[in-house]
Amino acid sequence: MRLAEMTWQEAKRAVEEDRLVVVPVGSTEAHGPHLPLDVDTHQAGHVAELLAERVGAVVAPALPYSYAVTWIGFPGTVTLTAETFQQVLVEIVESLAAHGFRRVMILNAHRPNGSSVDVAARRVIDNLAPGAEFQVSALSYWEPGAARVNALRRSQVGGMGHACEFETSFQLATRPELVHMERLEGVHAPLVGWDLVAPGEPARTYEAWPAPSEAHPAIFGDPTVASAESGQAFLDAVVDALVEFVRRLESGAGGSYAERSTEVAR
């Protein structure tokens, strides 16, 4: 169910039913010569709706603007500062909490947002009274299912970064009319030193952001091996893992600082 399409009375009922609210977070930024600017926003919203269908959650409107400085030199990219982005998230979540929603998930689809999403969630909790009954999850949608996606990939490690096998396959599976694979001909898109789903990503080291050029067409990784079939498999894997994550929380597993049960499952 979509929050934006509810009346306020229906939203009140959702509060009374103690429904989880999923806040999808994307970006508006360059994604190579072959994908649209709204890839992250679309993917966040699409995954959120599939998750909501299975766990009975409410989906808030997807946030299309975030911390996208990496690609600000590429026309069409829109960015917020990290500070502004964090504050927007804090105020969105606090608004939901003020109405009585007790469970919120910030579902990110843009890797550079990760630290800001985490900071925003922590700030919301810091502002609560100790012992308040409220829980906010902060995660990127691929994280719970990363190992499953990694097992399905065709690219080498470093091939799943940005406008890559992962994102291109996702778009081929869901919006093929917006994907232009023919525009990748002759494009140089090397593997990169980090990867969305491979285990053991090293400590991050940052360098100056790339300038727009034919030599760097806003791609990190390898989109040439992407396919609709892979995209559907990736999508199924990440949604299944997210459902399992939500079910664990609903079972009383608690948040990151809850005491871990030592009881052996029987």
Model segments located where?
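Extended, histidine- and acidic-residue-enriched regions that form the cofactor-binding/catalytic faces
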Residues: M1-M105, A109-R266
